[in-house]
Design a protein with these regions (language model features):
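C-terminal accessory module of base-excision DNA glycosylases/AP lyases that mediates lesion recognition
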Residues: 2-93, 99, 176-203, 221, ...
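Phosphate-/polyanion-interacting regions in eukaryotic proteins
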Residues: 62-158, 188
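Intrinsically disordered, low-complexity coil segments
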Residues: 70, 210-213
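A general structural signal for short secondary-structure junctions and capping/turn motifs
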Residues: 106-110, 211-212, 238-239
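Alpha-helical ds-nucleic-acid-binding substructure associated with the helix-hairpin-helix region
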Residues: 128-211
Length: 320
């Protein structure tokens, strides 16, 4: 299971070259999910969800460019973008992912070192910590623990997504112990399962979690998909991804509007439409991009629908 994500049963497509992957998707397609976002768009009319999807992409990218160029806020006339928090259109522009990619880049030519660095980075996922550490710090577990606990701004790790315990050889490893003590000793296990995945992120995630037994394996998923930045020959950027509970309501709207059979087909269609709706796009969208941008569109239209409010952590504050 990836972050409690809903898997769809995708029949008669070419993605089922891997029987393990098929069995995984089929098993989770039948699981009843308790999705807190399921009804967030109920009653809201979205005339053209495809056009709205690409509007969000272009407007959010324009905001990022203006902000990085030092222009004064609000950077947009859209009141929802002025008040709400959103990720960037391209995930490599978000500060967390940017820190992960910069931290791991020096070892991109060594697959074992890259896997170690990425697993540590996604278990940490804290920009300020990753920006201060070096890859050589990962080689000494006791020294690394001291660095994280006593010499870094606290908290040393981010709560952007939950990181639950890892189980290995009868021992439960909490977040700190997993990324400092365990991972350096199981690189061959991680490498073997990633190579056995046939470049598929879901297959690799599930192979690893058969042993880890994490109740929420989203950190594994994020780590494996990040491999595609550096080694697309190992994990394909075009690898199909499961539908997250946050993305499901908007992907449902897109699927219905496009009259397609499932989210996988919907994501493929959205990728094919980007040249029509955004000819100047700086790079090709991938399945994971479309999935998470659909989640951001669900957030955007939840504000419009009054099911999400501009308060607390949802409220954008200019100088943060």
């Amino acid at each position: 299971m990836v972050n409690g994500l809903q898997y769809e049963k995708l029949e008669n497509t070419d993605i089922f070259y891997n029987r393990f992957f098929f069995a995984t998707l089929q098993r989770y397609s039948n699981k009843i999910m308790n999705n807190p976002y399921e009804k967030t768009l109920d009653g809201l009319i979205i005339d053209d969800p495809v056009k709205s999807f690409f509007y969000w992409c272009k407007e959010r990218e324009n905001i990022r460019i203006k902000r990085e160029n030092g222009e004064k806020p609000p950077w947009t006339s859209d009141p929802i973008f002025q008040q709400g928090r959103f990720l960037n259109t391209f995930r490599e522009d978000d500060k967390g992912s940017k820190a992960v990619l910069q931290f791991c880049d020096p070892v991109k030519s060594s697959l074992k070192e890259l896997i170690h660095a990425l697993f540590f980075a996604r278990w940490c996922n804290q920009q300020t910590t990753l920006n201060r550490l070096t890859l050589s710090d990962l080689k000494n577990p006791s020294s690394l623990k001291d660095l994280l606990l006593n010499q870094m701004d606290q908290p040393w790790s981010s709560e952007a997504y939950p990181v639950v315990p890892v189980h290995w050889d009868g021992i439960k490893y909490e977040r700190l112990e997993a990324c400092t003590e365990l991972f350096p000793n199981i690189i061959n296990f991680l490498l073997d399962n990633i190579l056995a995945s046939n470049r598929n992120v879901v297959t690799a995630t599930n192979l690893i979690n058969q042993t880890f037994q994490m109740t929420n394996d989203f950190p594994i998923f994020m780590t494996v998909i990040d491999i595609s930045w550096f080694r697309p020959d190992i994990i394909s950027p075009e690898s199909p991804v499961p539908t997250g509970i946050g993305a499901k309501p908007y992907l449902d709207r897109l699927q219905n509007h496009l009259d397609l059979e499932n989210h996988h087909a919907t994501i493929k269609k959205m990728i094919s439409l980007q040249g029509e709706y955004w000819p100047s796009i700086r790079r090709q969208l991938t399945p994971v991009d479309v999935e998470y941008i659909s989640c951001e569109n669900r957030k955007y239209f939840s504000y419009k629908n009054g099911t999400k409010l501009f308060e607390g952590k949802n409220l954008f504050i200019t100088n943060e």
